[in-house]
Regions:
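Adenine nucleotide phosphate-binding catalytic loops in nucleotide-utilizing enzymes
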Residues: 3-6, 10-13, 17, 195-321
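Short, surface-exposed amphipathic charged segments that create phosphate/polyanion-binding patches used
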Residues: 112, 158-159, 208-219, 399-407
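A short, flexible N-terminal coil/short beta segment enriched in small residues
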Residues: 58-87, 259-261, 277-279, 289, ...
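Phosphate-binding loop of NTP-binding sites
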Residues: 3-9, 13, 17-198, 205, ...
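Fold-independent oxyanion-binding glycine-rich loops
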Residues: 75, 99-100, 123-126, 146-147, ...
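Buried hydrophobic packing segments
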Residues: 85, 89, 108-112, 271-281, ...
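Residue-level signal for inorganic ion chemistry
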Residues: 145, 178, 270, 274, ...
C-alpha cells in the first residue's frame, strides 16, 4: 500500500491556473489535432503532443503534477501490461493512459493533454526515455518487464540500456520498482533500489543475459534460479508475486484464479506485474486480478478480423524475444499462417535476428512468407525446413491461404500497414453494401 498523498491532492490542483505558455501549448495542440483529423491524416494525437512540447518544453512535468503515476517499460509487453495496469487501477479513479502505444514524449504529452483531470496515470514509456520521463512525472511506481535486444541498429548494446535505467532509478529513491526477478538485466537495474517488489514474471529468452551486467562474469542457471559467478550477492531475488497456469500468488498468502483474455504465458507474467503495480498504488488485489482478465485486443494485437472467407488473428512481434514468445501463441491447427517482415527504420534495418528465432516449429505447417523482406524470411524458413510460399503483399498472402482461420504474425511496420489495409478493405465492403 502506498503512503503517498491520495488523489485529493491532484483534485485541488485541477483548479490551479496554468502558465500562459502551457495554455497556449494546449490550445495549439488542440488545433493541430483538429487539423490532422480534418485533413484525414490521422487521429492527431502525436502531432498535438509534438506541437505542445515545442511551445512549452516543461508541459509534461506541468500536466503530470499531482497525478499518481505508474510507468511501465521493457523490451516486450509494454502496451499489454500498461492496458492491464490501467484496468487494475481504474477502481481507484480515472486513469490517464495511451490508447495506441505511443510511448515516447509526444505520445505521453498527448495522453496527459487529453486527460488533464485524471488523478492517476499508467504510462507506457520507451526504455530509452524512462530516465527523463521519470524526472518529469515523478512516478510512484515503475514497472520493469524485461530487457533484450530490440533493434540492433537503434539501440546497440543492451547493457547500456540497463545502466541508464539503473542510473535513472537511483535518482528517484521514493519510487516503488516492480521488477521481473527472472530477468537478469531487469534485476540488475532494480537491485540497488530501496523499494522493490520482485515478481517472477518469467524469462523465456535468456540469450541476452549469459553474462553478469555488473561484473562481466558468467550467469549460472539452475531450475528457476540464477546467480552471478562474479558477485555472490547478485542472484535471483525471492519473488513476492508469482503465477502458474491457473492462479496468481502474492504477499500475505494471497492467491486467486487468474483467467486472461489474451494468449500466452508471457502475458500471464505481464498480468502479474500489472496486478503487483496496481496493488502498490492501493488497489484491492482480488479486484485487480479480475480487471486484468478483461483486457483483450490491445492496439490491434490479438484482434480477430473477418476478411472474405478468412478469420484473421493478428499478432505483433518486434525482436527475437518477442518473436519467440509470439510463435508459441500460434494456433498450429489454423488453416494458414502468414509471417510478415519489413525492414524499415522503426523495425530496425538489421534483420540478422531472424536467425535467432526458432522457425523450425513450423515444419509441419504451411507458411506464407510476406512483407517487404519476404525474401530474407524465405531463406530463413528454407533453412528451418518450414514448407512455405512467398507472397510479399500481406493482404494477398492472407487471400492465398485456404478458407478458414489464418494466423498473421508481423513485425512493427508490417503490422501497422496491415492494420491500415484491413481498415481500408472494411470500409470498401461497407461502401458496397
Amino acid at each position: 500500500m502506498s503512503d503517498r498523498p491520495s488523489s485529493a491532492g491532484s483534485a485541488s490542483r485541477r483548479g490551479t491556473r496554468l502558465p500562459v505558455r502551457t495554455s497556449v501549448a494546449l490550445a495549439a495542440a488542440a488545433a493541430a489535432r483538429w487539423a490532422s483529423r480534418a485533413t484525414g491524416r490521422g487521429k492527431g494525437s502525436m502531432i498535438g503532443g509534438l506541437v505542445a512540447a515545442k511551445i512549452d518544453p516543461e508541459i509534461m512535468r506541468r500536466l503530470a503534477a499531482g497525478k499518481r503515476t505508474a510507468i511501465i517499460t521493457g523490451t516486450n509487453g509494454k502496451s499489454t501490461t500498461t492496458r492491464m495496469a490501467a484496468a487494475a487501477m481504474a477502481e481507484l479513479g480515472e486513469v490517464a493512459t495511451q490508447a495506441d502505444g505511443a510511448n515516447m514524449d509526444a505520445g505521453i504529452i498527448a495522453t496527459l493533454t487529453l486527460t488533464r483531470t485524471a488523478p492517476y496515470a499508467a504510462l507506457e514509456v520507451d526504455e530509452l526515455h524512462v530516465p527523463h520521463v521519470s524526472d518529469a512525472v515523478d512516478p510512484e511506481v515503475l514497472v520493469l518487464l524485461n530487457l533484450s535486444r530490440d533493434q540492433l541498429d537503434r539501440v546497440g548494446e543492451i547493457n547500456m540500456i540497463e545502466r541508464r535505467l539503473r542510473e535513472g532509478i537511483a535518482q528517484h529513491p521514493s519510487t516503488t520498482v516492480v521488477a521481473n526477478c527472472d530477468d537478469v538485466l531487469v534485476t540488475s537495474a532494480a537491485f540497488d533500489a530501496p523499494n522493490v517488489i520482485w515478481v517472477a514474471a518469467g524469462a523465456s529468452w535468456v540469450g541476452d543475459s549469459v553474462s553478469c551486467p555488473r561484473t562481466g562474469e558468467p550467469i549460472v542457471r539452475s531450475g528457476d534460479g540464477w546467480r552471478s559467478t562474479g558477485d555472490e550477492n547478485f542472484r535471483r531475488p525471492t519473488p513476492q508475486w508469482w503465477f502458474d497456469d491457473e492462479n496468481i500468488y502474492g504477499p500475505d498468502g494471497f492467491s486467486a484464479p487468474m483467467t486472461l483474455s489474451v494468449p500466452g504465458r508471457a502475458n500471464r507474467g505481464n498480468a502479474t506485474q500489472a496486478v503487483a503495480a496496481a496493488v502498490a498504488m492501493g488497489a484491492d488485489p482480488a479486484k485487480a486480478v479480475a480487471a486484468v482478465g478483461t483486457v483483450g485486443e490491445v492496439a490491434g494485437r490479438y484482434g480477430v478480423h473477418q476478411i472474405g472467407n478468412h478469420s484473421v488473428r493478428t499478432l505483433l512481434a518486434k525482436n527475437p524475444a518477442g518473436w519467440q514468445e509470439a510463435l508459441s501463441m500460434i494456433d498450429q491447427d489454423a488453416d494458414g499462417l502468414v509471417i510478415a517482415v519489413n525492414g524499415q527504420v522503426p523495425d530496425g534495418e538489421d534483420l540478422s535476428w531472424l536467425w535467432d528465432v526458432r522457425f523450425e516449429a513450423f515444419e509441419t505447417m504451411q507458411v506464407v512468407a510476406s512483407g517487404e523482406r519476404a525474401a530474407d524470411l524465405s531463406v530463413r524458413l528454407l533453412y528451418a525446413g518450414a514448407e512455405h510460399t512467398t507472397v510479399p503483399d500481406p493482404m494477398e498472402a492472407i487471400a492465398s491461404c485456404p478458407p478458414g482461420r489464418v494466423e498473421v504474425l508481423a513485425n512493427y511496420t508490417a503490422f501497422r500497414d496491415l492494420g491500415v489495409a484491413m481498415e481500408r478493405a472494411a470500409r470498401a465492403r461497407k461502401g458496397e453494401q
